[in-house]
Amino acid sequence: MDASETSSVVNLPKQLRYEHFIRRVADTGQVWGLVRDGWAIGKTGDGALVFPLWPTDALAQQCAVLEWEGYVPQEFDLQELFDELLPQIEADGILPGITYTPDEYGLTPSHARLRADLQARLRQRASSGNEPVE
């Protein structure tokens, strides 16, 4: 993802950033978070805890500012998202936060919606003969 594409994604409304996340993660099999001594955790406007996720390292890196200064992008694969991260954050009462930007919270879908949307995109890719690019 080049700088102009990153800039374009940052300027999209939350829903379109979410749709971009679903497409990109299903296409690449990669998900990114920010880590320092532990994973970056945010909050919604009403105080709910959020685990922010990004579809690229460049988008994650842009958010390594303010309270997340010193955090670095860390990749994990789609299988880890399905098998480990989503079940763990759901059990902990933490929402997934999709493609935060330096200036705006990301969309916070339910765990079930995020899983269903990613699985639907993966099925769509499989039916067209495409596998995630590693």
Predicted regions and their residues:
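Conserved NAD+-utilizing ADP-ribose enzyme module
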Residues: M1-E134
